[in-house]
């Protein structure tokens, strides 16, 4: 399993900005998800250096950010929790600076949505305690047992927790793959005719 934190954030690089999700992951993440294989430029997160992140190709394009640019850091902002009126906008946000060391490419939607970083970076940004997270991601060894594991977790955790499979989390991605497979099948069928 892997501990994760996901939160919408405001990203700023030089004079450009974008709203996306910061996803803080611990060092077990690659045992659950082989996202490092999608990194086409640079490297995956360096867990020894808290301030490193990996951005999607869509975010890289929007912000004009590359990997290993030591001259400029990626600034990440989230609103400070609280209630009521904000008297000074400069004090309304928590922020950290990060160094993009890799760029990944999966789907257009995911590439514009997620920035992956060290779990401790996300905890610092959100003022979370070291044991505070927003989710756990599991890898089930036998894919045929996924529904059973999901049912057991829902039963044991109760209604306060959301238990989703990878397909449910990334439904758009899996629908796109199915559409591509159908389109490929139809094209090959037409070629054979």
Q: Which sequence ranges carry the predicted segments?
A:
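A residue-level structural signature of the nucleotidyltransferase/glycosyltransferase Rossmann-like core
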Residues: 51-52, 114
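A generic structural signal for short hydrophobic patches within well-formed alpha-helices
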Residues: 30, 59-60, 122
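Basic-flanked hydrophobic alpha-helices used for secretion and membrane insertion
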Residues: 69-160
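The feature marks short, hydrophobic/small-residue-biased sequence motifs that occur predominantly
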Residues: 5-48, 92, 116-119
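Peri-transmembrane interface segments
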Residues: 142-193
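Short beta-strand elements
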Residues: 1-3, 162
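Short, solvent-exposed hinge/capping segments at secondary-structure junctions
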Residues: 34, 55-70
């Amino acid at each position: 399993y892997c501990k994760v934190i996901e939160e919408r954030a405001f990203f700023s690089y030089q004079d450009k900005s974008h709203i996306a999700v910061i996803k803080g992951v611990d060092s077990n993440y690659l045992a659950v998800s082989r996202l490092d294989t999608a990194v086409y430029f640079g490297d995956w997160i360096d867990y020894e250096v808290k301030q490193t992140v990996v951005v999607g190709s869509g975010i890289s394009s929007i912000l004009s950010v590359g990997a290993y640019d030591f001259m400029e850091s990626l600034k990440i902002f989230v609103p400070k929790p609280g209630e009521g009126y904000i008297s000074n906008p400069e004090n309304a946000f928590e922020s950290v600076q990060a160094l993009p060391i890799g760029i990944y490419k999966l789907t257009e939607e995911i590439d514009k949505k997620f920035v992956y970083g060290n779990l401790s970076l996300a905890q610092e940004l959100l003022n979370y305690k070291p044991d505070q997270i927003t989710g756990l991601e599991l890898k089930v060894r036998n894919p045929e047992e996924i529904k059973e594991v999901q049912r057991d977790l829902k039963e044991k955790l109760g209604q306060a927790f959301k238990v989703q499979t990878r397909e449910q989390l990334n439904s758009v991605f899996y629908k796109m793959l199915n559409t591509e497979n159908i389109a490929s099948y139809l094209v090959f069928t037409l070629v054979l005719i």
